[in-house]
Amino acid sequence: TYALFVDPEGALFGVLKSDSGDPLDSEVAIGDFFWMDLFAREPSKAGQFYQQVAGYEISKGEVKEGVERVVLTSHDKSRAGVVPLPEDANRAGWLPYVRVADVDATLKKVTTAGGYVMVPPTPELLESNLAIFVDPQGGVLGIVRWDEPQADKE
């Protein structure tokens, strides 16, 4: 059973109840969804909303380039980040990231298939290599090369 909702900042999110329960935490393999970031006008307030609705604990993540990240955690695991929405963005939204072996090779496949690169490879973010692209239908996805097994993500 699942349902879709819109949070107070306009970000679409869904909830799911599986008949088999939640999956166990495991290492993130190449091709697996790796992380989620919510881009919000007021990250602290957005974090509080998800704390009230989904029971997440809130912690402050590392500040990079003057930007403070809110981290949503459960069962002592970091689950998602909440970061400031770019000033030129229209509304809040969630951005999923997928773990890849090679960011540059993946972006070549993206452009060959008709997508375009929104944020070029950026090694400074997440202390790894990260890029964001848009597919031909307008879907936005982040990709990350992560060399170490993920025990916890912040």
Language-model segments: what does each one mean?
Residues 1-6, 33-41, 85-111, 129-134:
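Vicinal oxygen chelate
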Residues 3-4, 38-78, 105, 112, ...:
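Core segments of cupin and vicinal oxygen chelate
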Residues 6-19, 57-93, 101, 136, ...:
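Conserved short beta-strand elements that form part of the metal-binding/catalytic scaffold
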Residues 16-48, 53-59, 93-96, 145-154:
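N-terminal beta-strand motif that seeds the catalytic metal site of vicinal oxygen chelate
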Residues 85, 122-123:
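Short loop/turn motifs that cap or connect beta-strands within the blades
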Residues 118-122, 130:
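Active-site pocket scaffolds in enzymes
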